[in-house]
Amino acid sequence: MKRSVIENRLQKLFETSPVVVWDDPAGEFADNLADLDLPGATVFVDRDGERFELKALVNGLAATDRLLIYRATPEGAVSPATDTSADWLADVMSYAPIFTADAASTQLADLNALDTPEMRAALKQFAPFFKRASGVKRVHELRASFSTPNELALAVITAALGSDTPATADWTLIAFMACAHEQGSVDAQDKLERAGAWGAFCRMTRDYVGFAGDASKEDELSVHVLMSALHAVAPHGLAERDSGACLARGGDCGALGLESDVPAVLAAEHGAPSPAASEQTARHASEVLRLWLSIAHGAGTVHDALLHAAQTAEHAYGLPAWFGSWPTDALAQIAAFPAVDETLIKRALRALAANERVDENLRTALDQRRTSVWHDRFAATYAALAAALDIEAFGQLSSIDSDARVVWNTYTTSWFRMDAAYRRFRLAFRTARNEVPSLDKDLHRLADHIETRYRCDFLRDSAAAWEHAAEQDLATNGYVADIPRQRDFFITEVEPLLRKTKRTWVIISDALRFEVAAALGEELERTTQGQVHLASMQAGFPSITACGMAALLPHAKLRMTPHVAEPGRNPAGFDVFVDGLPTQGTPARQTVLQTYLDTYHPGMKGVALQSSAFMNMERAERKEAVGAASVVFLYHNRIDAIGDDATTEHDVFDACRDTITELCQLVSQIVREFRASDILITADHGFLYTAQPLGETDKVALTEVQGQIAAYGRRYVVGMRGVSSDAMMPVSLTATSDGELQGLAPREMIRIKKAGGGENYVHGGISLQELCVPVLHFKNFRAGSKGFRDRSYATLSLVSPLTTITNASFELQLLQDDAVGGKVLSATYELGFYLDDGTPATEVRHVAASSAEPDAINRTNWASFHVRAAVMDHVGATCRLVARNVDDPSAEELVLARCTLSISVGTSFSSDW
């Protein structure tokens, strides 16, 4: 420090006290005292034999006198500035300001660190790091003050690694392991050696987590942490019984040179000693792992380092085979190893494929895995399992009333969910097949089972119930009485809106079956300010595009007109007219629409457009295309375009997913640009789809039909009057053809044999999946308007009574307050206990609030917590259980409980680190 700076600082201190003590432990400035320019001040050097004189001088100071006492501390002695217990000048030291100018004192002062021999030794050890001007600043940013060398060491290690994490032992270990994974353990070691911190780091790993190996060797430290934590929770007695066989089937604990760190339960057969880790270091290792898990969600180096360590440990110790012998409830507590997820999934897959009940413990474990760190690695497989469990939960169809309306209403309120679950399963299965190769065989077995459950049980039984109830009406009228009909759509749905809104929007999505529309409604509720009402209507026969599109247009009369058969051409086909006008193609449909408006609403204009063309227009072009139209029909075609093509029919469920996305975008565009308040979304028909090849018993030949055929498809026959078949159901077409035509429909899921491919995706028949057409009414609301309901996230509340925490580990039951659906959105919460000063008292747990169960008892969940060793002895401290919404960081945190820590422990688990 420059002399002028020293003089200036001393003068400022004299302004506050007549006596200033200069503490110079190393005596660096003893030879420079005579050169100081301190007007009016006496400089006295504290030496042995001269303290009586110094004491007298102090006691005789006049009011205007100034005295600088210079004190040097011999090597190894305690500075009087720190310890005044045996100091002749203790009274002076109690009030006189202390001045230091040596480099160590300055650095310690800048760090707000105690000036002790131990701290000076630590500072000397880290001298390479503090040579850089930014060293002190960076370390001080990590911690406000330092009382021990270990605190300083942790901050230096953290800073040297370039980490922004807190400078605590657990965070520092994770920072090193992440750095070692990303840059190599040699580079990570080099960073600490250049900072003079490698020795301190090695001591910390030994003292804190019991690691006696070489941290410079790839993976040793990280695997030690994982295995020490696993050892602490291994089911008692299980490992001693099974470890030898487990390791023989694939374990190689020597591959990492980890014999000394192998948990005793796994090392017994290899003669390796048990780890010397104490209960304290084992607890610390578990805390490190819990912290690692809580911050490893999502991509990133920390996540990748944990994955690499877990997979290395799995291979080295043969863990997948060992986990296979664990009970489910014990496995459910293990979150660090992907092999645990794989084991749980495999158990569920095999139980379902064998038509066995998945026990409650396994269901709970799978449900809790939704927030696990490895969920994304198995996302498609978990999705397939969830859908399969929904299918199994559906059970067998109960006996159904013979009233067709009851069957219809049962389908639109309950049965359609089976179609949705099957669609979700097939979508997930396509991806899951390539997700985890070791699960491929089990997945295919499950897929076979699900196909049987859906096709042979549900579809067959639901079709039988519907046919039994509707057969007479279909044969007599061609439709079921008292169920809304598609041909009345314009009168019942569009006309009322014409009278009260400036413009009515109608979106017709080809083959948008009811269950897909239900999913669309949920997505619209979730992503917009609008609200959705979903109803249904029955399509006409045959349930094909030509008939459905015509029926949705305004009309008084719909007629199916057969083509005149040409020689050698049979069947010849038919056309569909409304009020004498053709309906094939968008221009023809606009003509029908405008003709109706001219007749019944003079002055109104109607527009019909393809949605793809509409969305591809510029904003100004869309405005111009719509103009002053009072009715806009937008035709969307994704599902049918994919399904009707034999080369792409197996992509139809992907098309359903894409349709939901596209229709949401279309609705948002209409609302944003045209301020639409009401939008109707419907379809011309539904569809049937089963993934696996059909057998011969699932088909009927056209030779079973007697009479002249006008047209036919996989699921229908339209013939001239008198056509019949003992293998098919008659469907009257009298009302739509003046008795000229007659319909025939294959029963259940039977397809008509036809040349060419394309038999898995079909429509045209009378099944509920084909006939049940959605009528989705989307109503937009402006914020604050009457009827507006804002979106909100599902919240959590605590079920378990909690006033005092008396155990180091405990479980709490949580309730998801509302079912997810409509405007209630799913959310993931980070839950943790915190002391009043913000210090974490436990690890952070991730809990999902995503249940759509209407019954509150089915929306409960359990979360386990472990009190951190550092706060175990804070008896009487108050803490809060805080829930933070991961999906909405701006949301206010929820305080679910306030309680008191009161843990009685025989052994302290606190650490010098």
Where are these predicted regions, by residue range?
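Ligand-binding pocket scaffold of soluble enzyme catalytic domains
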Residues: 510
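…; additionally, a secondary subgroup of soluble metalloenzymes is captured
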Residues: 1-504, 513-679, 683-913
